[in-house]
From Swiss-Prot:
GO terms for biological process: protein stabilization. Belongs to the small heat shock protein (HSP20) family. The gene is ibpA. The keyword rRNA processing does not apply. GO terms for cellular component: cytoplasm. CDD domains: ACD_IbpA-B_like. This is Small heat shock protein IbpA. It comes from the Bacteria. Keywords: Chaperone, Cytoplasm, Stress response. Monomer. Forms homomultimers of about 100-150 subunits at optimal growth temperatures. Conformation changes to monomers at high temperatures or high ionic concentrations.
Length: 137
């Protein structure tokens, strides 16, 4: 019987390669997938999370990190007056979205454009973990 060692495949998954699996685990929260988000590959070491936060002003959004956990919260300062809707398709509720980040990830910044909150991420692999060429003498 032949055994396959998959460890070399996991060794190449430093940082962001594992990020997608970790982000999916954050999707299993009780918020029912609200607000929706995308994860975009910008280049080899840069990623962007886009979160749909229509209806929230910049001062109503909070982004924090603790250990390897990115937390995005949205809360309306003034609750809207009681309204009678014929149809309500736009969610106006407060939210908290958590993302488990992989190792060696730095949050570069965030900006709010047209109802989308963009969070830019960068993979910074320490020199000690990067491949290096050994000279043969």
């Amino acid at each position: 019987m032949r055994n396959s060692d998959l460890a070399p495949l996991y060794r190449s998954a430093i940082g962001f390669d594992r990020l997608f699996n970790l982000l999916e685990s954050g999707q299993n929260q009780s918020n029912g997938g609200y607000p929706p988000y995308n994860v975009e590959l910008v280049d080899e070491n840069n990623y962007r999370i886009a979160i749909a936060v229509a209806g929230f002003a910049e001062q109503e959004l909070e982004i924090t990190t603790q250990d390897n956990l990115l937390i995005v919260r949205g809360s309306h300062a003034n609750e809207p007056a009681q309204r009678t809707y014929l149809y309500q398709g736009i969610a106006e509720r407060n939210f908290e979205r958590k993302f488990q980040l992989a190792e060696h990830i730095k949050i570069k910044g965030a900006n709010l454009v047209n109802g989308l909150l963009y969070i830019d991420l960068e993979r910074l692999v320490p020199e000690s973990l990067k491949p290096r060429r050994i000279e043969i003498k």
